[in-house]
């Protein structure tokens, strides 16, 4: 099925809400503390990521949309870290600084793919003057196609009714990720996106689909909403609108590692898609696909356009895992956070045959993820001669990506993938044939990083060159 992504580059969105910084400390756990019955984590990696409303803005920016973020911060290192990180991904920050309060920060300690503890550093922003937030919203209304109110009950949205009114008067849809059980404060919003627990805390426990629909429609009527989207974890999503049949969408998640920030991804994709001019039903379709991608990553994460396109088209149609170098680096970083062993190989793979398939399957068995780096058409021509490749790069990558053993496919322009390998630094570099390990491009860089290099045998009798010669011989008869 041909699926066109929304014109995200034309979308303008403002996000207003509770901004926070997510800190992650990673390290191995090898012993119990003598001071208390708790594990000792030897921290070797520290990461900082925008969270809360800032993660919503990150998700919108990652799609290529134009986004402005408004929220409350302190005047501290956390606020500066947020501004710097967000500016690097093209999020325009317009924070209101509150000297008496720290920027909300959440610290998570992780070891062996498990979160051991979370520490929150915060003081609520309730009671502050909301006028600076209102002024920023008013200034942006003429240039945005959607307003997102990201509520984590930290004080940025105490005047949410005024914000809704300002946007609706300007004809701008208001999307809200709600918090708590007081949905009266969201009266008049275009769309609420509660998860199932949040929905049932307000509407009551639902024993069936029909009951969920009935109670959801009552909430829409009670609070003058235009629509309600209930996110239901492994059961997918349900969109409810007045005078329309319910739209149930099954989950698209293949693996679930972490649901942190998944709600931010959903509302971010919804807003960007609506602001690009698509319908609400289309926006939900793309948001559901994006949620299936992001829960397969560790921590608050975003979804790139190519990941979203792969998700909505499906593996068989797109060559799942065909990536740019930057997208591959991000995918590898996420895999390593999950403790996965990354294997990498390379080749032309012009006419895929049984030998290739067997070799790649064996390579995949040596780790958790397999990267295949493919020579570009120009690189192949220099290596194999003017008559090659038989199949252009795009087709070769699609075929490789369709193999169950292959996770990610990337191309390179040079004669060898040495530069690419040095940038990825796989845990294991493999090559087929009769090479010596030290002859393999990238081996020195992998060894220097503590990785391994291995040579695997090809299946006897399988050769692209022999296949081409046989075809030529048969055609001459």
Curated annotation (Swiss-Prot):
Top-level division of the source organism's lineage: Bacteria
Amino-acid positions noted as binding ATP in the UniProt annotation, renumbered to this chain: 195-198
Documented EC number(s): 2.7.1.167, 2.7.7.70
Nucleotide-binding in keyword set: yes
Keyword Nucleotide-binding belongs to the record: yes
Region Cytidylyltransferase, annotated ranges: 344-477
Xref: InterPro entries: Bifunc_HldE, Carboh/pur_kinase_PfkB_CS, Cyt_trans-like, PfkB_dom, RfaE_dom_I, RfaE_dom_II, Ribokinase-like, Rossmann-like_a/b/a_fold
Recorded metabolic or biological pathway in which this protein acts: Nucleotide-sugar biosynthesis; ADP-L-glycero-beta-D-manno-heptose biosynthesis; ADP-L-glycero-beta-D-manno-heptose from D-glycero-beta-D-manno-heptose 7-phosphate: step 1/4; Nucleotide-sugar biosynthesis; ADP-L-glycero-beta-D-manno-heptose biosynthesis; ADP-L-glycero-beta-D-manno-heptose from D-glycero-beta-D-manno-heptose 7-phosphate: step 3/4
Catalytic activity: D-glycero-beta-D-manno-heptose 7-phosphate + ATP = D-glycero-beta-D-manno-heptose 1,7-bisphosphate + ADP + H(+); D-glycero-beta-D-manno-heptose 1-phosphate + ATP + H(+) = ADP-D-glycero-beta-D-manno-heptose + diphosphate
Stated role: Catalyzes the ADP transfer from ATP to D-glycero-beta-D-manno-heptose 1-phosphate, yielding ADP-D-glycero-beta-D-manno-heptose.
Protein family according to the UniProt entry: In the N-terminal section; belongs to the carbohydrate kinase PfkB family. In the C-terminal section; belongs to the cytidylyltransferase family.
PANTHER family hit by this protein: BIFUNCTIONAL PROTEIN HLDE (PTHR46969:SF1)
Record's protein name: Bifunctional protein HldE
Species this chain originates from: Salmonella dublin (strain CT_02021853)
Lineage, highest ranks first: Bacteria, Pseudomonadati, Pseudomonadota, Gammaproteobacteria, Enterobacterales
Gene: hldE
């Amino acid at each position: 099925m041909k699926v066109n992504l929304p014109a995200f580059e034309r979308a303008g969105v403002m996000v207003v809400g509770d901004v926070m910084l997510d800190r992650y400390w990673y390290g191995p756990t090898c012993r119990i503390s003598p001071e208390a019955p708790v594990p000792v984590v030897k921290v070797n990696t520290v990461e900082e990521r925008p969270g809360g409303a800032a993660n919503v803005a990150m998700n919108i920016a990652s799609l290529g949309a134009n986004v402005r973020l408004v929220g409350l911060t302190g005047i501290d290192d956390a606020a500066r870290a947020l501004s710097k990180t967000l500016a690097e991904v093209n999020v325009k920050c317009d924070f209101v600084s509150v000297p008496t309060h720290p920027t909300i920060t959440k610290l998570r300690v992780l070891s062996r793919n498990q979160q051991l503890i979370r520490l929150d550093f915060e003081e609520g922003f309730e009671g502050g003057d909301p006028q600076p937030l209102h002024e920023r919203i008013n200034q942006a209304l003429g240039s945005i196609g959607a307003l997102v109110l990201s509520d984590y009950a930290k004080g940025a949205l105490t005047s949410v009714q005024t914000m809704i009114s300002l946007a609706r008067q300007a004809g701008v849809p208001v999307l809200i990720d709600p918090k708590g059980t007081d949905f009266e404060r969201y009266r008049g919003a275009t769309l609420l996106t509660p998860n199932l627990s949040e929905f049932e805390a307000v509407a009551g426990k639902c024993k069936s689909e029909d009951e969920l629909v009935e109670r959801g429609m009552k909430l829409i009527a009670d609070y003058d909403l235009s629509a309600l989207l209930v996110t239901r974890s492994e059961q997918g999503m349900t969109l409810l609108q007045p005078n329309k049949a319910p739209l149930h969408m099954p989950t698209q998640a293949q693996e679930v590692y972490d649901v942190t920030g998944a709600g931010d991804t959903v509302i971010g994709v919804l807003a960007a898609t609506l602001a690009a001019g698509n319908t609400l039903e289309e926006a939900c379709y793309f948001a559901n696909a994006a949620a299936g991608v992001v829960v397969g990553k560790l921590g608050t994460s975003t979804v790139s356009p190519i990941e979203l396109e792969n998700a909505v088209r499906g593996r068989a149609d797109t060559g799942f895992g065909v990536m740019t170098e930057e997208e591959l680096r991000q995918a590898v970083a996420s895999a390593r956070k999950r403790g996965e062993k990354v294997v990498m190989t390379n080749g032309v793979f012009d006419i895929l045959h049984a030998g290739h398939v067997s070799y790649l399957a064996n390579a995949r068995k040596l780790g958790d993820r397999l990267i295949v780096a493919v020579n570009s058409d120009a690189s192949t021509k220099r290596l194999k001669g003017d008559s090659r490749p038989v199949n252009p790069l795009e087709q070769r990558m699609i075929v490789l990506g369709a193999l169950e053993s292959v996770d990610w496919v990337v191309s390179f322009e040079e004669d060898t993938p040495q530069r690419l390998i040095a940038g990825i630094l796989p845990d294991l570099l493999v090559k087929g044939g009769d090479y010596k390990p030290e002859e393999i491009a990238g081996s020195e860089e992998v060894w220097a990083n503590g990785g391994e290099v291995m040579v695997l045998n090809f299946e006897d009798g399988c050769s692209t060159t022999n296949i081409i010669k046989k075809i030529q011989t048969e055609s001459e008869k």
